[in-house]
């Protein structure tokens, strides 16, 4: 079987400090769900994924990694601050493998929600047909498609369906499988799943990078959160986790959670590799400052990276078309801030970057619901202003201009500077022509 080539590339990183401030959008101590006529507290409900629809509604996933998680997918009510099962409580029924069993990753675009169902409940073996991608129409709340993954694509004993990005240009979904075994004595079997969304009458999916070294957890790496070791007896072993698709849909970035490495793949090469068994080059895109969970690419060619070891959020700016060099910037205000413990998933809405901080490393047994170690709240949604930036699904918009007075002034000054520069060039050129003419005249006089 033809394997992916792994190319090591030397990349220069520049750490810069950004003064971009962050703000608390909402924080809560215990997750509260709102059902038909009553509210209920859930101490085993940990928020993980977060996304926005076009109307600004907030959707949050609560994977059923523990008992009594009443709903695995919910809509956040910004007025009551309660979570409402979405699209309904019935669709969140974990006793039915056809319903939403355990959701972590999902994506929203153009009125459609793509929900990735892990199928794994409280560490048990997933039921038949429970590992799937479910597609809903937001407005009607109707399910429009269901893609059930067969064993050769997602092995129930190992599959841990984690993150998802949508390639709207090719109508494909890329899904990270962290490959965490049910039996922790076994080795991880992570990989990447490519799902064809065009085919609706049957599953059309391919698994690549199966147990490739770049998707495996780093066996020598022991994760620390705010300098505190995660798991005392054995290191946390999680393979490929966060994935991000570039705004031109040409490059897929990924990183194992138990690692500080960042990798990328050219999409066309990867698809050609699948079709003709040709070589596909994995690019080592750099050594990150710390381990990451969520990744997110933006319309302005920024790669946003969570830093779970310290609570930082990083921005990797692509400054070369061939992705051989990246420029890192850092939100200074997040450094060492315990309130951002374990930033999990990223989302962009209304020129703001949002993320959930959920203390995954402490959940659920070391969570203090009476006196949270992170302050007043155990869980938080933060945001930071990211002017002129948007979701990768909107496509690249590198030349986008915000026509505010300040930016107009900058562009006017820039245009004037260009005109002045060109005038000097023209003047210099004219002078040079005069000198040449004079020299030619002198030569003519000497000859005659």
Residue ranges and their predicted role:
Residues 345-403:
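Blade-level signature of beta-propeller repeat domains, shared across WD40, Kelch, NHL, RCC1
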Residues 41-54, 94-111, 116, 151-176, ...:
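Beta-rich, blade/repeat-based domains predominating
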Residues 60-66, 115-119, 124, 174-184, ...:
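Conserved beta-strand positions in repeat-built beta-propeller and related beta-rich domains
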Residues 72-78, 129-140, 188-198, 370-389:
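Beta-propeller blade signature
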Residues 139, 196-203, 265-275, 316-324, ...:
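Short loop/turn segments immediately following beta-strands, especially the blade-tip
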Residues 25-40, 82-98, 144-156, 202-233, ...:
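Surface-exposed loop and turn segments in beta-propeller and other repeat-based domains
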Residues 399-414:
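Extracellular juxtamembrane-to-transmembrane boundary of type I single-pass membrane glycoproteins
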Residues 29-71:
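Beta-strand-rich domains and repeat architectures in extracellular enzymes and scaffolds
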């Amino acid at each position: 079987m033809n394997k992916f080539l792994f190319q090591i590339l030397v990349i220069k990183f520049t750490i810069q400090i950004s003064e971009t401030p962050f703000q608390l959008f909402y924080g809560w101590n215990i997750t509260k769900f709102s059902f038909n006529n009553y509210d209920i507290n859930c101490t085993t409900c940990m928020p993980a994924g977060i996304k926005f629809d076009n109307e600004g509604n907030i959707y949050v996933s609560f994977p059923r990694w523990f008992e009594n998680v009443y709903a695995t997918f919910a809509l956040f009510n910004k007025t009551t601050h309660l979570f409402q099962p979405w699209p309904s409580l019935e669709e969140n029924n974990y006793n039915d493998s056809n319903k939403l069993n355990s959701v972590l990753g999902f994506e929203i675009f153009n009125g459609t929600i793509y929900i990735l169902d892990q199928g794994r409940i409280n560490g048990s073996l997933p039921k038949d047909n429970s590992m799937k991608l479910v597609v809903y129409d937001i407005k009607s709340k109707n399910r429009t498609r269901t893609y059930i993954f067969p064993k050769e694509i997602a092995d129930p004993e190992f599959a841990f369906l984690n993150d998802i990005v949508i390639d709207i240009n090719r109508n494909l979904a890329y899904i990270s499988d962290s490959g965490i075994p049910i039996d922790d004595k076994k080795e991880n079997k992570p990989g990447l799943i490519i799902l064809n969304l065009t085919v609706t009458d049957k599953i059309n999916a391919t698994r690549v990078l199966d147990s490739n070294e770049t998707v495996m957890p780093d066996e020598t790496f022991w994760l620390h959160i705010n300098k505190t070791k995660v798991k005392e007896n054995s290191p946390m072993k999680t393979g490929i986790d966060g994935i991000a698709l570039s705004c031109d849909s040409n490059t897929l970035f990924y990183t194992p959670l138990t690692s500080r490495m960042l990798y990328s793949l050219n999409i066309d090469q990867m698809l050609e590799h699948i079709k003709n068994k040709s070589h596909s080059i994995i690019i080592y895109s750099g050594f990150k400052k710390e381990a990451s969970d969520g990744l997110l690419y933006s319309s302005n060619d920024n790669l946003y990276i969570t830093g779970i070891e310290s609570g930082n959020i990083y921005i990797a700016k692509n400054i070369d078309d061939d992705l051989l060099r990246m420029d890192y910037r850092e939100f200074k205000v997040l450094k060492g801030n315990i309130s951002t413990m374990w930033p999990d998933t990223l989302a962009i809405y209304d020129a703001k970057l949002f993320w959930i901080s959920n203390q995954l490393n402490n959940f659920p047994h070391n969570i203090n619901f009476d006196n949270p170690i992170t302050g007043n709240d155990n869980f938080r949604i933060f945001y930071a202003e990211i002017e002129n930036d948007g979701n990768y699904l909107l496509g690249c918009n590198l030349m986008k201009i915000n026509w505010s007075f300040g930016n107009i002034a900058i562009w006017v000054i820039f245009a004037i500077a260009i005109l002045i520069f060109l005038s000097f060039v023209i003047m210099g050129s004219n002078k040079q022509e005069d000198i040449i003419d004079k020299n030619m005249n002198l030569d003519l006089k000497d000859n005659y």
